[in-house]
Curated annotation (Swiss-Prot):
<dbReference type="InterPro" id="IPR020594">
    <property type="entry name" value="Ribosomal_bL9_bac/chp"/>
</dbReference>
<comment type="function">
    <text>Binds to the 23S rRNA.</text>
</comment>
<keyword id="KW-0689">Ribosomal protein</keyword>
<dbReference type="GO" id="GO:0003735">
    <property type="term" value="F:structural constituent of ribosome"/>
</dbReference>
<protein>
    <recommendedName>
        <fullName>Large ribosomal subunit protein bL9</fullName>
    </recommendedName>
</protein>
<dbReference type="InterPro" id="IPR020070">
    <property type="entry name" value="Ribosomal_bL9_N"/>
</dbReference>
<dbReference type="GO" id="GO:0019843">
    <property type="term" value="F:rRNA binding"/>
</dbReference>
<dbReference type="GO" id="GO:0006412">
    <property type="term" value="P:translation"/>
</dbReference>
<dbReference type="GO" id="GO:0005840">
    <property type="term" value="C:ribosome"/>
</dbReference>
<keyword id="KW-0694">RNA-binding</keyword>
<dbReference type="GO" id="GO:1990904">
    <property type="term" value="C:ribonucleoprotein complex"/>
</dbReference>
<dbReference type="InterPro" id="IPR009027">
    <property type="entry name" value="Ribosomal_bL9/RNase_H1_N"/>
</dbReference>
<dbReference type="InterPro" id="IPR000244">
    <property type="entry name" value="Ribosomal_bL9"/>
</dbReference>
<dbReference type="Pfam" id="PF03948">
    <property type="entry name" value="Ribosomal_L9_C"/>
</dbReference>
<comment type="similarity">
    <text>Belongs to the bacterial ribosomal protein bL9 family.</text>
</comment>
<keyword id="KW-0687">Ribonucleoprotein</keyword>
<dbReference type="InterPro" id="IPR036791">
    <property type="entry name" value="Ribosomal_bL9_C_sf"/>
</dbReference>
């Protein structure tokens, strides 16, 4: 009997794959536990429609990430902070500060977890930050910290 897996099944296959199993295994284990459905023409069409929709969604997300990366190119994030005489900050600047700046100044909503800073920014100066927007798509930002 051919079935379509609804979840990954160890030793059998990945989610949404079409596999051939014995009738008893399908009727007594896979289908009752909700791990698979019988591979009828309607179910195969539903599976293909879902795969197509997922593919379109990923393409759309990739296009949006590339567009956002273009917008981020050339942006210099200038943050003001209180610092001591030797240029050492009272505290430090984080990816949240960079994210807040981009939201306020450029109306770009970027999650702070996507911004990776090379080192902790604890003194005045210029730093390079990388924004990971999508697997394989990232943008570089220049972060300047100036005396308040």
């Amino acid at each position: 009997m051919k079935v379509i897996l609804k979840e990954d099944v160890k030793g059998l296959g990945k989610k949404e794959s079409l596999v051939e199993v014995s009738d008893g295994y399908a009727r007594n284990f896979l289908i009752p536990k909700g791990l698979a459905v019988e591979a009828t023409a309607a179910n195969i069409n539903i599976m293909q429609t879902k795969k197509e929709a997922e593919k379109n969604r990923k393409e759309r997300e990739l296009a949006q990430a590339k567009e956002l990366a273009e917008k981020l190119k050339g942006i210099v994030v200038t943050l003001k902070a209180k610092a001591g005489e030797n240029g050492k900050l009272f505290g430090s600047m984080t990816s949240k500060d960079v994210s807040d700046y981009l939201k306020k100044q450029h109306n770009l909503d970027i999650d702070k977890k996507k911004i990776s800073l090379p080192e902790s920014m604890k003194s005045l100066g210029t730093y390079e930050a990388e924004v990971k927007l999508y697997p394989g798509v990232s943008a570089k930002l220049t972060v300047k910290i100036e005396q308040e």
